[in-house]
């Protein structure tokens, strides 16, 4: 049905899409961080697009096919809910969403909410998430054909294309993409004090993706339906270590096939009522070939079949001009078939009330979560915003949330422990924001102080490969943080320039052990500058990550030094939607590791050409 509707739209002449409004989206505070426009389009994946955000730690295990996850404010990647067009993306098997698989060609924006999203209409899942990352697809504004080719270092070849149209209140998009790379790159290691150059192996990838998206926008509403397919085979780069006089390299392979279908709808019903519904079904088939690094003739193949069904409904009511009420219910079921079988059903219910007392905005909410395997949890939250002037904002947040153990955490022999307890978090934060324009100048400064109290902290550490992890509770963790961001831009008739600087202080430790918890830098930051002149644009991005430890101790073998990387992108925009771009990555050829024994690439060059007709 969806395919036939999309086909009908493409053969019909384009028309004007009338404006529609959904009242529930008003009165929303800005996200903690966001990215859009050229920077988002130039990113190779969602992981690449958000790497400059303050307050996050992006775990990157190197290589084109390496796992990439995001950790917000030292809470772990499982506490960050990922949403695509308002529908959650998750993985009940290992609680790890690989951001390297989420591409940006058709995205309008990526927004990070570190704490509570303030929208009046939300699903129950959103109310209980410690933080959330929202990816939103762009809405077609006419009939267009987009073609893009990206390639360069590591043997990368990545063609993609999309065709979109709109007619009346309908819009549609079809897209295809492929990725291929051998992924090999040189790296340095110390062998008996000597600098030895080796080549990173088993980083190749072959992937194909396809999808379709359909929109219907009646008066006062918005409805979407999409289907996506992903098929990939990749090498899994293992850690670099020396044993028996050699450096055994991982030969593990991973094959993914993923089908997802999702729908969402939001409608104003009149008399102050608004309805929000969402649904998603996903099928993920994963085959993992586990090859012994010391004896490649020994291998084992693991097959995993994960199905997930999700449904949500939310009803909002504008009881008074200054009072908005919202009740939400989510239900999700997950089934995993492998060498063990596991299933989990969970129901989430939430209620919130928002008091819109200008210049104050107060939101009180509570989420209840219950699962078929016996977990019960209540997540209350209080969010207060104060706008004394149009250019100033102050806010405070108090919230409780939890992270359930995944199937891998609980059931797998090499990984799991059935004695694991849910990880519980209390979050408290306060922030201020100044955002002002003076003629051609614009300025924005934001600071946020936060404290996280974590009990029964779940720690995941790679156990020889990216597929086998060791899981354990470590008790209590305290996280104190301070985030700053400042930006300025100047816009003239023929040129534009801007600068953004970010800094994060993050002290995360077990009260019984004064050392920083593993992989969390005390200091980090980023620096971005751009300039536009006529059809030319230049972007410079710098990223600073402080020293870290791979264990909560000061042992020299657990130390990871600080590093700084610099990237530059040069682009030219020509007629007929032609755009050429050259990306210079790690210009200073810095040698660094984000994860111990997983070396990252040095200097490399990527290029792209795109056409929009």
Language-model features: locations:
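A beta-strand signature from Gram-negative outer-membrane beta-barrel systems
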Residues: 104-146
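C-terminal beta-signal and adjacent terminal beta-strands/loops
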Residues: 544-551, 570-613
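Membrane-embedded beta-barrel scaffold of Gram-negative outer-membrane proteins
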Residues: 272-288, 394-395, 423-480, 487
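Extracytoplasmic beta-strand/coil segments of soluble accessory domains associated
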Residues: 47-88
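Gram-negative outer-membrane beta-barrel transporters
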Residues: 321, 326, 359, 450-453, ...
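Periplasmic-side early beta-strands and strand-to-turn transitions of outer-membrane beta-barrels
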Residues: 134, 142, 166-254
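N-terminal periplasmic "start-of-domain" segments of outer-membrane beta-barrel proteins
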Residues: 17-46, 69, 77
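Structural signature of Gram-negative outer-membrane beta-barrels, strongest in the C-terminal barrel
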Residues: 2, 320-452, 502, 522, ...
């Amino acid at each position: 049905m969806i395919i036939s509707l999309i086909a009908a739209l493409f053969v019909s002449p384009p028309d004007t899409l009338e404006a529609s409004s959904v009242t529930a989206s008003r009165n929303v505070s800005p996200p903690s961080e966001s990215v859009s426009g050229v920077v988002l389009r130039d990113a190779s994946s969602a992981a690449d697009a958000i790497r400059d955000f303050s307050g996050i730690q992006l775990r990157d295990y190197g290589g084109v096919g390496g796992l990439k996850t995001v950790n917000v404010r030292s809470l772990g990647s499982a506490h960050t809910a990922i949403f695509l067009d308002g529908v959650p993306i998750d993985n009940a098997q290992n609680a790890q969403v690989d951001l390297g698989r989420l591409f940006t060609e058709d995205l309008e924006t990526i927004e990070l909410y570190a704490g509570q999203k303030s929208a009046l209409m939300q699903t129950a899942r959103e109310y209980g998430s410690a933080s959330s990352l929202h990816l939103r697809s762009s809405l077609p504004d006419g009939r267009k054909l987009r073609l893009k080719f990206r390639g360069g270092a590591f043997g990368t070849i990545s063609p993609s294309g999309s065709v979109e149209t709109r007619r009346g209140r309908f819009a549609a998009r079809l897209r295809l993409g492929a990725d291929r790379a051998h992924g090999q790159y040189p790296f340095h290691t110390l062998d008996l004090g000597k600098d030895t150059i080796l080549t990173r192996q088993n980083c190749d990838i072959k992937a194909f993706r396809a999808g379709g998206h359909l929109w219907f926008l009646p008066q006062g509403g918005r409805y979407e339906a999409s289907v996506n397919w992903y098929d990939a085979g990749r090498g899994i780069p293992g850690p670099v270590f020396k044993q028996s006089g050699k450096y055994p390299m991982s030969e593990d392979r991973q094959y993914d096939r993923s089908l997802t279908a999702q729908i969402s709808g939001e409608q104003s019903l009149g008399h102050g009522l608004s309805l929000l519904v969402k649904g998603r079904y996903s099928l993920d088939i994963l085959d993992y070939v586990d090859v012994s690094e010391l004896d490649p003739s020994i291998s084992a193949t693991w097959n995993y079949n994960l199905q997930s069904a999700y449904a949500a409904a939310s009803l909002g009511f504008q009881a008074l001009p200054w009072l908005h009420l919202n009740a939400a219910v989510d239900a999700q079921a997950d089934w995993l078939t492998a060498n063990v079988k596991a299933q989990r059903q969970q129901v989430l219910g939430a209620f919130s009330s928002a008091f819109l007392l200008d210049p104050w905005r107060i939101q009180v909410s509570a989420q209840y979560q219950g699962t078929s395997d016996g977990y019960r949890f209540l997540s209350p939250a209080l969010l207060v915003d104060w706008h004394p002037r149009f250019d100033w904002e102050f806010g405070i947040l108090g919230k409780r949330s939890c992270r359930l153990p995944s199937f891998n955490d609980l059931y797998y022999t090499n990984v799991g422990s059935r004695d694991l307890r849910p990880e519980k978090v209390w979050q408290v934060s306060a922030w201020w924001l100044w955002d002002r324009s003076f003629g051609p100048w614009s300025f924005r400064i934001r600071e946020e102080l936060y404290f996280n109290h974590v009990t029964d902290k779940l720690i995941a550490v790679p156990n020889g490969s990216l597929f086998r992890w060791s899981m354990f509770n470590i008790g209590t963790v305290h996280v104190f943080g301070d985030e700053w961001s400042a930006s300025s831009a100047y816009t003239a008739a023929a040129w534009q320039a801007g600068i953004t600087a970010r800094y994060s202080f993050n002290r995360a430790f077990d009260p019984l052990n004064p050392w920083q918890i593993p992989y969390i830098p005390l200091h980090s930051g980023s620096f971005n500058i751009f300039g536009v002149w006529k059809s030319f644009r230049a972007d410079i991005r710098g990223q600073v990550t402080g020293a870290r430890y791979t264990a909560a101790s000061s042992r020299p073998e657990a130390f990871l030094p600080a590093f700084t990387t610099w990237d530059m992108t040069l682009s030219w925009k020509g007629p007929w939607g032609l755009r050429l771009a050259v990306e210079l990555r790690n210009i200073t050829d810095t040698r660094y590791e984000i994860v111990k024994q997983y070396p990252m690439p040095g200097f490399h060059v990527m290029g792209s050409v795109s056409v929009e007709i």
